[in-house]
Amino acid sequence: MIKTKICGLTEVGQALATARTGADFAGVVFAESKRRITTEKALEIAEALKPLNPRPMLVGVFANQTAEEVNRIASVCRLDRVQLSGNESWEYCNQVNLPVIKVIHVAESTTAELVIQEIQAGLKALKKTPVFLLDTHTKALFGGSGQSFDWQIVKQVSLKYPVMVAGGLNPENIQGFIKIAKPWGIDVASGVETDGIKDTAKIHLFIERVKDADGNRIC
């Protein structure tokens, strides 16, 4: 089954709605972003999700912050995983206590071979195997831009390595994306928002369409 992550949650109600869909990961942002939340709010979300069984893993999103800050917030907010969306080195990743989701930024000039080389370098350098997340490179934002990149890159990389993908995905295009790219996982933020706020109806529709497309795949 394709893994799913709803990212940029800012309220407990959004997190509970995400959990009800059966999503695998719920993301809260601590990096500079319009979706950034306080540690207090993140802890509220963690405590609301904790009694649920099953429940989505709570992922904290960071970008170019110190490893000490990342580990402190992860502990205080009872995170399950840490997503590193900046330009963090592999050495830096090894300093993070929790399992890591490492973003690989895909620019217009990026090829599938370059992505594969970066994944191979990470696997060689890291003490623990991370989840690799391919996301669109933008100058201003570390994710959540709503901009997509060449899906053929995902298709080629997925033949060799399991990857999660973000960037421009929404309920309207997700089934076409899955058919072409066949990713291990999918991450969405702006694609399930209305006027910049998480839309629970869109979250449900998105996950429903992922499950439907995944069930119709011929592996």
Curated annotation (Swiss-Prot):
Gene3D superfamilies to which the protein is assigned, alphabetical: Aldolase class I (3.20.20.70)
Annotated GO MF terms: phosphoribosylanthranilate isomerase activity
Domain of life of the source: Bacteria
Catalytic activity reported: N-(5-phospho-beta-D-ribosyl)anthranilate = 1-(2-carboxyphenylamino)-1-deoxy-D-ribulose 5-phosphate
Keyword annotations of the record: Amino-acid biosynthesis, Aromatic amino acid biosynthesis, Isomerase, Tryptophan biosynthesis
UniProt GO BP: L-tryptophan biosynthetic process
Enzyme nomenclature, EC number: 5.3.1.24
InterPro entries: Aldolase_TIM (IPR013785), PRAI_dom (IPR001240), RibuloseP-bd_barrel (IPR011060), TrpF_fam (IPR044643)
Name of protein: N-(5'-phosphoribosyl)anthranilate isomerase
Naturally occurring in which organism (per UniProt): Dehalococcoides mccartyi (strain CBDB1)
Gene that specifies this protein: trpF
